[in-house]
């Protein structure tokens, strides 16, 4: 689960919702559109893009600092794929497979039928599903803080707690996500007023029905069989100090994937925030090694 209301400067980001969108960047300006590429180099229509998938309460903007590094070498597409569905307790609430279908449809709508795929946390489960079930579209895979099974006793307890707090004590959930999502070193850089401001903004500016929906998707995650089917080159990246998806779970997911290699980032769960350069470097080293 991401805490999208925090940026490297402590600013707040509005939660995005609705149908899948792709962030488009040309030079220093940015906007949101249906389909587009982020790039810092001359356009090459045949170049395979990197598609980025956010986590449970995340949005495409979470990747901004990572994208600054990636686009020096590769075009990037980042999607807001978690379209809200009315009635989060409904049997019609989305599953990982629904999110996967949305990602593939959005990429295809832009004429991108082959891509490298990066998923974070819940997005890693979505990426795992896509790599297995749409294998012809996925050239390589990077899974960041991924997990394979949301009903694991520890993961289920965590997601049940998130869901309870999202409904009853949003401030407590914000505090919990700060404590468990960030490393001690990174969190210690914020003073008390900044931390309180982050929590207040997290409560005020999030799309809570969407978050509840996506926590329910977390609980239903089971991509163990899909992981075994992945044939594309795969990198599993672990946050050394991750308390939300502890290293055991990323290891467990990687062990299911025949092609998986492993890397570790010295950060908590939110590595895209704590160590964006390290994270981008690990991605690029892998991707450029496989596809120079």
Residue ranges and their predicted role:
Residues 119-123, 127:
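Gly/Ala-rich beta-loop-alpha elbow adjacent to hydrolase catalytic centers
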Residues 267-280:
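Catalytic histidine-centered segment of alpha/beta-hydrolase-like enzymes
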Residues 29:
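Conserved glycine-rich cofactor-binding loop
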Residues 230, 236-238, 242:
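Short beta-strand/loop motif that positions the catalytic acidic residue
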Residues 37-89:
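Conserved HGGG/HGGXW glycine-rich cap/lid loop of the alpha/beta-hydrolase fold
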Residues 65-68, 77-118:
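Active-site loop/oxyanion-hole signature of alpha/beta-hydrolase fold enzymes
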Residues 132, 139-169:
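Flexible "cap/lid" loop of the alpha/beta hydrolase fold
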Residues 152-154, 172-226:
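Conserved alpha/beta-hydrolase catalytic His-Asp/Glu region
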């Amino acid at each position: 689960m991401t805490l999208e209301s925090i940026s490297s400067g402590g600013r707040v980001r509005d939660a995005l919702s609705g149908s899948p969108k792709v962030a488009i960047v040309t030079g220093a300006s940015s906007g949101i559109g249906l389909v587009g590429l982020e790039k810092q180099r001359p356009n090459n229509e045949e170049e395979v893009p990197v598609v980025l998938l956010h986590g449970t309460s995340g949005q495409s903007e979470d990747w901004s600092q990572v994208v600054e590094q990636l686009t020096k070498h590769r075009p990037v597409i980042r999607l807001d794929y978690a379209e809200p569905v009315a009635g989060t307790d409904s049997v019609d609430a989305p599953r990982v497979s629904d999110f996967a279908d949305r990602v593939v449809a959005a990429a295809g709508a832009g004429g991108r039928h082959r891509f490298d795929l990066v998923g974070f946390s819940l997005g890693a489960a979505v990426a795992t599903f896509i790599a297995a079930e749409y294998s012809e579209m996925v050239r390589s895979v990077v899974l960041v803080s991924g997990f394979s099974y949301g009903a694991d006793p520890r993961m289920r307890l965590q997601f049940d707690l998130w869901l309870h707090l999202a409904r009853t004590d949003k401030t407590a959930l914000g505090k919990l996500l700060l404590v468990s999502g960030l490393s001690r070193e990174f969190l210690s850089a914020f003073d008390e007023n900044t931390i309180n401001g982050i929590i207040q903004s997290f409560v005020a500016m999030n799309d809570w029905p969407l978050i509840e929906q996506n926590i329910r998707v977390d609980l239903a995650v089971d991509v163990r069989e899909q992981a075994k089917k992945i044939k594309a080159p795969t990198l599993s990246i672990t946050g050394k100090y991750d308390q939300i998806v502890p290293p055991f779970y990323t290891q467990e997911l990687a062990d299911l994937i025949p092609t998986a290699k492993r890397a570790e980032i010295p950060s908590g769960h939110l590595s895209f925030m704590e160590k964006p350069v390290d994270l981008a470097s690990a991605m690029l080293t892998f991707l450029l090694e496989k596809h120079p």
